[in-house]
Amino acid sequence: MAPDIQRVKAFLLDLQDRICQQLSAVDGDDFVEDAWQREGGGGGRSRVLRDGVVFEQAGVNFSHVHGDAMPASATAHRPELAGRSFEAMGVSLVVHPRNPYVPTSHANVRFFIAEKPGADPVWWFGGGFDLTPFYGFEEDAVHWHRTARDLCAPFGDDVYPRYKKWCDDYFYLKHRQEARGIGGLFFDDLNTPDFDTCFAFMQAVGDGYLNAYLPIVERRKTLPWGEREREFQLYRRGRYVEFNLVWDRGTLFGLQTGGRTESILMSMPPLVRWEYGYQPEENSPEAALYRDFLPVRDWVK
């Protein structure tokens, strides 16, 4: 079946609406929308909730851009795409909570299609979600990964382990030799067995994000915290910034295609700190993050 771009776009717009509505319901504050146009073609809706009770900053972005030539970041691992026009659309979000006991979360679902006259279109889906705790809780990690495993199950027994590994490998800071968080799912270049199956999987990932995240937020948002926890949260947020600016393909793609910089960098935490040579105290809750949660684990054995 030929790709149905309008069906994908309708799902993505609705997904953005639903995620914003549910995050607003948890926080009590509203998102502010910024509709924008891209000079080279296309545009989007950026929505940001700032200075909320639960969420210090949450950004949920929809974009649909098109152009006459694929950018270098997209053709580097797919050289056959050079010389094709393209359309790219997706929803991308990052939630930075206020309480250090609530983890940061990120999710993204996207669709690419590249075409040229006289040739079949090249298309694929990508996306996933991942969790970045500051203070780890076993039950939260298990719930997050169980939700991921269960949404993958209808698509095959090998889907969850494959996309979990891809997530573990992708969200890794090589210069720190350290995982960004506890992972989740990551997939890209998905175009088999057919459009409908791939689209259904992308929908399952998009719909599964809140099922994975909101129960964790509800469990942790009222835990008391102080300056020590806040300092560690801000320090660990530095890893988020490092990953996004140094390693993230989506950030590079957006900047190379002349994307909207404010929307691309919406994922950045509002406050962050670095500390030279930081080492957590032995046997502290901070040390437990490095010892028990950042190393790759099978959470749903």
From Swiss-Prot:
Biological function: Involved in the heme biosynthesis. Catalyzes the aerobic oxidative decarboxylation of propionate groups of rings A and B of coproporphyrinogen-III to yield the vinyl groups in protoporphyrinogen-IX.
Lineage of source species: Bacteria, Pseudomonadati, Pseudomonadota, Gammaproteobacteria, Enterobacterales
Compartment(s) of residence: Cytoplasm
GO CC terms in record: cytoplasm
Entry keyword GTP-binding: no
Gene giving rise to this polypeptide: hemF
InterPro entries named among the record's database cross-references: Coprogen_oxidase_aer (IPR001260), Coprogen_oxidase_aer_sf (IPR036406), Coprogen_oxidase_CS (IPR018375)
Binding site for substrate: S92, N108, V109, R110, G258, G259, R260
Keywords on record: Cytoplasm, Heme biosynthesis, Metal-binding, Oxidoreductase, Porphyrin biosynthesis
Residue(s) at site: Important for dimerization: H175
Enzyme class: oxidoreductase
Residues covered by region (Important for dimerization): 240-275
Primary residence: cytoplasm
Subunit note: Homodimer.
Enzyme active site: H106 (proton donor)
Pathway where this protein functions: Porphyrin-containing compound metabolism; protoporphyrin-IX biosynthesis; protoporphyrinogen-IX from coproporphyrinogen-III (O2 route): step 1/1
Protein name: Oxygen-dependent coproporphyrinogen-III oxidase
GO molecular function, one term: coproporphyrinogen oxidase activity
The protein's Enzyme Commission number: 1.3.3.3
Ligand binding (a divalent metal cation): H96, H106, H145, H175
Cofactor list: a divalent metal cation
Similarity comment text for this entry: Belongs to the aerobic coproporphyrinogen-III oxidase family.
Catalytic reaction equation(s): coproporphyrinogen III + O2 + 2 H(+) = protoporphyrinogen IX + 2 CO2 + 2 H2O
A single GO BP: protoporphyrinogen IX biosynthetic process
